[in-house]
Amino acid sequence: MAKVILFHGTPDKNVVPTYGKGEDKHDYGRGFYLTESLELAKEWAVCRPNKENGWVHKYELEIDSLKILDFQNENILSWLAELMKHRDASDSKRYRMLAGKFIAKYGIDTSEYDVIKGWRANASYFYIAREFVRDNVDIDILEDLLSLGGLGIQYCIKSELAYSKLKEIKDALYMVSYDEFNEKYNLRDAEARRKMRD
């Protein structure tokens, strides 16, 4: 039985992953987001500016029977198209039209997948997405630009089956210091933005 250990960083001490919950405008749409990196989960737990400590919940995901889409194994343009489905890089009519064509050409139908795995995005990625669909960024350098961020890999639990295979390891709940890890989160984010601009 193949399993993967994942972490969920959150301001909430009590978390119940529930099918159908979550924000539509996250990178891969509605779902429950986790990472294999404990350090990233700690940063994500305190990424809000409210100066409160956060929590990292540890989970075990049984993956044998799950259909997983890993964007690291796909064309980078397919990943970018997936982000465009859920997050608006611009509210201009021209961008929306171009983004629609881009999604139609490069997008992957993710509806049959139980889990989506891939890079995490921040605002810098959407700047690049906007410039790319406007033909201001060459495809030859797109992958290099997108790999500069270093914002980590995330898993998004999508299906009822995947939720049923996710089990929290309750005695591994970890409190995260806001003062220590919020600064790390902000530094990582600022460095990703700087690399995108340079």
What are these regions (language model features)?
Residues 31:
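Catalytic centers of nucleases
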Residues 1-28, 46, 57, 192, ...:
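ADP-ribose/NAD+-binding catalytic cleft of ART/PARP-like enzymes
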Residues 2, 26, 47-52, 62-198:
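Conserved NAD+-utilizing ADP-ribose enzyme module
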